[in-house]
Amino acid sequence: MDLLATTSAVAVSSYALLSTVYKTQALYARPASAAPLRDDPGQAEVALPSVDVIVPSFNEDPNTLSECLASIASQDYAGKLQVHVVDDGSANRDLVGPVHKIFANDPRFRIILLAKNVGKRKAQIAAIRSSSGDLVLNVDSDTILAADVVTKL
C-alpha cells in the first residue's frame, strides 16, 4: 500500500504543478496591449488586439480580388484592423489597378506594389515587415471571408 500511496501523491502533485505552470504561462502570454482581466464583466472591457490582414496577390482576376478585399472590408471586428495588399509583380497590374485605387481610399488598407515577382512567401514577408498588429492573418487573394471571421479569431 505504501507504493500506491506514494504514486498517488506524486501524480496529484505533478498535476498541481503542471496546472500552475499552465496558468502562469497563460497570464504572461497575453498581449501587452490587453487590459487586465476582471472577474466582474461590468467593471471594464478587455482591449481587443489589433489585427493585420496580409493579402498577397499575383495575376489575380480583378473581380476575384475585389470580392476578397470587400469581404475583408466588411468585417464586424470592433478592434483595429489593418489590411496589407501585396501585388507580387503582377503582369495584369493595369487590370487590378482600379481595384487597388478603390481600396486605397479606405484608411485601413495599404497597397504594396512589388517591382517583380518574388513568390508568395517573400510577398507575405514584405507585408509583415510593415505590419504592427498584435495578430497577423494571412488570406489568399481568391478567398472570401464571412463577416465574423476576424472576430472569431
From Swiss-Prot:
Enzyme class: transferase
SUPFAM superfamilies: Nucleotide-diphospho-sugar transferases
Family per similarity comment: Belongs to the NodC/HAS family.
Name this protein carries in UniProt: N-acetylglucosaminyltransferase
UniProt-listed Pfam families: Glycos_transf_2
InterPro entries: Glyco_trans_2-like, Nucleotide-diphossugar_trans
PANTHER family in the record: GLYCOSYLTRANSFERASE (PTHR43646), GLYCOSYLTRANSFERASE 2-LIKE DOMAIN-CONTAINING PROTEIN (PTHR43646:SF2)
EC number: 2.4.1.-
Topological type in the membrane: Peripheral membrane protein
Alphabetical UniProt keywords: Cell membrane, Glycosyltransferase, Membrane, Nodulation, Transferase
GO CC term, one of those recorded: plasma membrane
Species this chain originates from: Bradyrhizobium sp. (strain ANU 289)
Intracellular or extracellular location(s): Cell membrane
GO molecular function, one term: glycosyltransferase activity
Role noted for this protein: Involved in the synthesis of Nod factor, a sulfated N-acyl-beta-1,4-tetrasaccharide of N-acetylglucosamine which initiates a series of events in the host plant species leading eventually to nodulation.
